[in-house]
Amino acid sequence: MCGRYASSASPTQLAEEFEVDDVFDDLPGPDYNVAPTVAVPAVFERRVRQPGGGDSGEVRRRLAPLVWGLVPSWAKEAGIGSRMINARLETVAEKPAFAKAFRARRCLLPADGFYEWYTPEPAPALPGGRAAKPCKQPFFLHRADGGRLVMAGIYEIWRNPAADRDDESAWLRTCSVITTQATDAAGHIHDRMPMVVPREAIDAWLDPSLTDPEQALALLSVTEAGALEAYAVSTAVNSVQNNDPSLLEPLPETEADPVDQDTAPAAPPGQDRLL
């Protein structure tokens, strides 16, 4: 599961890096503790509509805010989005909530890295036989080469059925992070991690004319050289009220709960790299 991440790049940086045509004005600022249901910067492509309706044939790449937590087009209310922050790679092409978006509305969700919480082995019982509550240690996972983590996502455009169709506020753009079985450093901390779009596959991944699910899935099977690294961070990240660069600072080793390599989930055989 990916339930928290950091995204500190400016719109200018993202627009240049991903060769964006249109940059929306209402993009969020740097966020070091991105949580579900907030707006996040996303890159996607849309066909330009003609003034009188219809497809002009032109495709534009956009950098725009999407609310994290996908609301399917058929949903009766937007609250369902808080339960749709992740789409599993294994079922994204078939699951009713995600299949339609996966066919034609794929996106990139740029990140500095993501957070996961490691739960150590249960502590010894307290006096009286009461079980001690294990203390979860947050870790920050990022590219070892310092590059941007380009998470694979899907997005949907939902209209509030109770609102006037011509009311701009009736429309909501939402997204979900595609996740896969964790490997490498992530596999010792949590069993899931975000799926990454390889740089050479970005153009094809965003192409709205690519509607074959199998072809889209194949794009995500390509890996790049490099690996994922993880380090312990302060429990301050546990609260979404905390949001500043200090959340990314490594915790001194004397304060971090070590990850037990013998009891932590191992990376699947032959899958030792994320990027």
Regions found by a protein language model. Name each.
Residues M1-L275:
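Short linear sequence motif anchored by a di-proline
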